[in-house]
Amino acid sequence: MKMMDANEIISFIQNSKKSTPVKVYVKGDLEGIDFGASAKPFITGNTGVVFGEWAEIQAALEANKGKIEDYVIENDRRNSAIPTLDLKNIKARIEPGAIIRDQVEIGDNAVIMMGASINIGSVIGEGTMIDMNVVLGGRATVGKNCHIGAGSVLAGVIEPPSAKPVVIEDDVVIGANAVVLEGVTVGKGAVVAAGAIVVEDVEPYTVVAGTPAKKIKDIDEKTKGKTEIKQELRQL
């Protein structure tokens, strides 16, 4: 897994072409109307749908208002710097409603549940489950065969670029609604209890709980049984 450098991300955002894409349902005398260089019109007769950049389509609508009877615009972003990740060829289970930005790395057989928000530069290892409504901030890195519980937050670090991101090592289980702050490393095989706020590094194969999170014990057989990772949930 390759972690993106913060300066790479900053440069990517700075130099990206900002986009305000729209989807326009349009009705009228549409023959011959040029909706702009970026536009992709799908028009049959006097009705159709046009996809493209708002600045171009807005100009076309204004220039041809005498020919256009009506239109409805769908728009979900303004001057967006980062597109969402193309999911079609990723070998993972990604459920509807997850928001995953471009420049995110997702390992094979990972699971991304509904409502998860995953920011640019994040890394998700093979077989890791990101549960419902989890937030992975910029450059947050999660190893293999982890479970990040519902509603948890792994804080992101893009600025300042010198700051260290959150690193979750392999085989870690994080309970629901936990928060791991910037710069923290959670060691291999550790367990973070639900609702914990983790402000310092967690040793491998330990259990931490509380606010702020403190070590309560080493991993034992009982804990292993209660935090078992089920590979059946990760099969494609």
Swiss-Prot record:
Source taxon at top rank: Bacteria
Keywords for this protein: Acyltransferase, Amino-acid biosynthesis, Diaminopimelate biosynthesis, Lysine biosynthesis, Repeat, Transferase
GO biological process entries: diaminopimelate biosynthetic process; lysine biosynthetic process via diaminopimelate
Sections of the chain in a coiled coil: none
InterPro entries: DapH (IPR019873), DapH_N (IPR013710), Hexapep (IPR001451), Hexapep_transf_CS (IPR018357), Trans_hexapeptide_repeat (IPR050179), Trimer_LpxA-like_sf (IPR011004)
A GO term, aspect molecular function: tetrahydrodipicolinate N-acetyltransferase activity
EC number: 2.3.1.89
Pathway: Amino-acid biosynthesis; L-lysine biosynthesis via DAP pathway; LL-2,6-diaminopimelate from (S)-tetrahydrodipicolinate (acetylase route): step 1/3
Record-linked HAMAP family: DapH
Similarity remark: Belongs to the transferase hexapeptide repeat family. DapH subfamily.
Xref: NCBIfam families: DapD_Ac
PANTHER family to which the protein is assigned, alphabetical: 2,3,4,5-TETRAHYDROPYRIDINE-2,6-DICARBOXYLATE N-ACETYLTRANSFERASE, ACETYLTRANSFERASE
Annotated protein name in UniProt: 2,3,4,5-tetrahydropyridine-2,6-dicarboxylate N-acetyltransferase
Source organism (scientific name): Bacillus licheniformis (strain ATCC 14580 / DSM 13 / JCM 2505 / CCUG 7422 / NBRC 12200 / NCIMB 9375 / NCTC 10341 / NRRL NRS-1264 / Gibson 46)
